[in-house]
UniProtKB/Swiss-Prot annotation:
Cross-referenced NCBIfam families: ahcY, PRK05476.2-3
CC cofactor note: Binds 1 NAD(+) per subunit.
Gene3D superfamilies assigned to the protein according to its UniProt record, in alphabetical order: Adenosylhomocysteinase-like, NAD(P)-binding Rossmann-like Domain
Organism: Gloeobacter violaceus (strain ATCC 29082 / PCC 7421)
InterPro entries in alphabetical order: Adenosylhomocyst_ase-like_sf (IPR042172), Adenosylhomocysteinase-like (IPR000043), Ado_hCys_hydrolase_NAD-bd (IPR015878), NAD(P)-bd_dom_sf (IPR036291), S-Ado-L-homoCys_hydrolase_CS (IPR020082)
Transmembrane segments: none
Any GO CC annotation of this UniProt entry: cytosol
Binding residue positions for NAD(+): 160-162, 194, 223-228, 246, 281, 302-304, 349
EC number(s) on file: 3.13.2.1
Protein name in the entry: Adenosylhomocysteinase
Length: 428
């Protein structure tokens, strides 16, 4: 990937442009682990399928996202990037995108809520034809505050489980009037990004924030979807005793048959040394649970928004708050017991660490890139609704990834193809 050093002619709001050189090196390092996206970028640069298309992307501003942004620009898009989380921005990456690639970026690590919302408005002022969203904040804000822009939107792509839940609610309410691609539901996304990416990066963030030993700890994982499965798998591999809380009986059975303890949060609250929420819902850990926790219990979140842990209630129960390490805040409750909160209750893997490894984001962002291309190719043909990534694109990404990994697999023989398409062969 070649950086284009030209006079800066784009709008931006980043921490420090002098960080660009460091960001450039890290973006190029991540690119080594993203061979699928590299191949798409090469094709895009020749075919220019997104020429002139205005894209507003609301994503975590990381080295992996930078490679997606560069691929979109190579495809001819007029892309603008804002952060999807106040704590997830990597300031050097933001600087490099502006300086080296001429991409407008509005993202500051640690930005307050007012700044974040202002950046969402900047994304809408771009008058996007395509919205790449991570939690559906841009889409939701447009529907509520800028309905004048809706007619110009070709479609949106959504990266997260949380965002797809919001899109489904919008569709049910009759306010989603354009097509949305459920990138999260692609097999090459959630099987790998959600499970292996979240599992590894969540524990990475916890360890960076606390430097605790996980072996022998009782870790309570709230939620056993793909993200929860990944967190539980890696925690168990580090020697922790894992307890799962769930509301879905099928997932609870899965956890039990995976050899994990399953119980309500009301029972787990007094057992856990470390609590990790990965549900996508609000107040999974709340007032009554804090009251039951051990002294020094650690709580953190790896779901999308900072609402899974009821920090307002914890603040009301506390007589004192103090930062004891970066991203590590101690709440002292009335009576002297303490509860430790990591990363302000935001995504701990991005607040205290670097997010998912580039290798899994390679497939996730290949899905994003192909989803955008699919929306453009099918402009005017898709009714309002939520669409899965076409199976042929999902399989194409998987095949490219396997080839990059040097792995070959079998193909069906003519006899096998005939058998699975017939009904008259059975017991011989």
């Amino acid at each position: 990937m070649t950086a284009v050093k030209t006079p800066i002619q784009v709008r931006y709001e980043v921490r420090n442009l002098e960080l660009a050189a460091e960001g450039r090196q890290r973006i190029e390092w991540a690119a080594r682990e993203m061979p699928v996206l590299k191949q798409l970028r090469q094709r895009f640069s020749q075919e220019r399928p997104l020429a002139g298309i205005r894209i507003s992307a609301c994503c975590h501003v990381t080295t992996e996202t930078a490679n997606l942004a560069v691929a979109l620009k190579a495809a001819g898009a007029d892309a603008l990037l804002i952060a999807s989380n106040p704590l997830s921005t990597q300031d050097d990456v933001a600087a490099s995108l502006v300086v080296d690639h001429g991409i407008p970026v509005f993202a500051l690590k640690g930005e307050d809520t007012a700044t974040y919302l202002r950046h969402v408005r900047v994304a809408l002022d771009h008058r996007p034809q395509i919205i790449i969203d991570d939690g559906s904040d841009v889409v939701a804000t447009m529907i509520k505050d800028r309905p004048d822009l809706i007619a110009g939107v070709i479609g949106t792509t959504e990266e997260t489980t949380t965002g797809i839940v919001r899109l489904k609610a919008m569709l049910a309410a009759g306010v989603l009037t354009f097509p949305a691609m459920a990138v999260n539901d692609a097999e090459t996304k959630h099987f790998f990004d959600n499970r292996y990416g979240t599992g590894q990066s969540t524990l990475d963030g916890i360890i960076r924030a606390t430097n605790i030993l996980l072996a022998g700890k009782t870790i309570v994982v709230a939620g056993y979807g793909w993200c929860g499965k990944g967190v539980a798998l890696r925690a168990r591999g580090m020697g922790a005793n894992v307890v799962v809380t769930e509301i879905n009986p099928v997932r609870a059975i899965e956890a039990a048959m995976d050899g994990l303890q399953v119980m309500p949060m009301a029972e787990a609250a007094c057992l856990g040394d470390l609590f990790i929420t990965v549900t996508g819902n609000k107040h999974v850990i709340r007032r009554e649970h804090f009251a039951m926790m051990k002294d020094g219990a650690i709580v953190c979140n790896s779901g999308h928004f900072d609402i899974e842990i009821d920090l307002v209630a914890l603040g009301e129960l506390s007589s004192e708050r103090r930062m004891v390490r970066p991203f590590t805040e101690e709440y002292t409750l009335e009576g002297g017991k303490s509860v430790i909160v990591l990363g302000e209750g935001r995504l701990i893997n991005l607040a205290a660490a670097e997010g998912h490894p580039a290798s899994v984001m390679d497939m996730s962002f290949a899905n994003q890139a192909l989803a955008v291309e699919y929306l453009i190719k099918n402009q005017g043909k898709l009714s309002p609704g939520i669409y899965n990534i076409p199976e042929e694109l999902d399989r194409q990404i998987a095949a490219l990834k396997l080839a990059a990994m040097g792995i070959a697999i079998d193909t069906l023989t003519p006899d096998q193809l005939h058998y699975i398409s017939s009904w008259d062969e059975g017991t011989e």
